[in-house]
Structures are given as structure tokens and as C-alpha cells.
Amino acid sequence: NEAWGQFDALKVCDFVRSLDSHRVIDHASGWYDQGGGDIDSMHKYILPIHLRKSKKRAFVVTEFGGYSNIVRGHTWNEKKAFGYLMFKSKESLTKAYKKLLDKQIIPIIDKGLSGTVYTQVSDVENEVNGIYTYDRAVLKIDENVLKDINSQLRY
């Protein structure tokens, strides 16, 4: 994943494929794409997403979003909370999430986007960019807006 160490990505991809040819392989999740595996994987925060077309591999935005909100009393460590883009309220976070999907994700579905992974499902330790809080007690985005916008992600 990213800069955690990408050594011989194509060689490792071939090795994994030799062990199990039925699994989908993302050989360079969000890092230097060498054209291997089944997925052209992009991690994109804040900046616009530009679709890359390929006849051989699925284009997947394997990390995007990172929108953050601190919910007092439901955070692992409020003093060290990190997020790519911080919002002060559930309402402002909901509005930004909807705008992100409306402007960046939904328009490229019909153009070849195969999948997305929003960062992230829940807060983890110092990262407060989850849809749910660290303790999974609070949904940080309005449930009805979340259902409505996410229902548009189906092809």
C-alpha cells in the first residue's frame, strides 16, 4: 500500500497469480502503477479524480474522500485527531460528501469507473475520517443523504 515498500511488484503479482489465478490482484495499491494486476488503482484525496482508461484492467479509486469530523466523546484521541479535510458539523460533512460524489465519482461511472473505496468506514485511532465514529456509535453523515447518494453508485 502506497509507500510502505513496493519491491518487484510485477514479479510478486506473477507469483500470486501462479498460486491462485482466480483472485483479483491490485499490484500497486495507490502507488507507482507498473501496468500489472487486474486493477489500475488510484488513491486520491482532495484533488480531482481523472479517469484512466484501460482495456485490460479495471479502473478503481481504491482510496478517496478522507473527509473528517470530530464527534466529542466518540474519538480515540481528540488532541491528535487527523483528517485530510476537517468539517465542524454533521451538516457540513454531509454536504461535502454529497458534493464529492456528485461532482467527482458519479460523472465517471458511465465513462469506465469500476469501483471506489471511501476512506473510511470508521475512525481509527488518530484518524477521524470515518463515516462512523471510532466506537461505531455515531453515523457522522446524514443517513438519508448517504443512502440516496450511494444508491446512485450502482451501474
Regions found by a protein language model. Name each.
Residues 146-153:
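Long, highly charged low-complexity segments enriched in Glu/Asp and Lys/Arg with interspersed Ser/Thr
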Residues 1-138, 149:
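Substrate-binding/catalytic cleft of secreted carbohydrate-active enzymes
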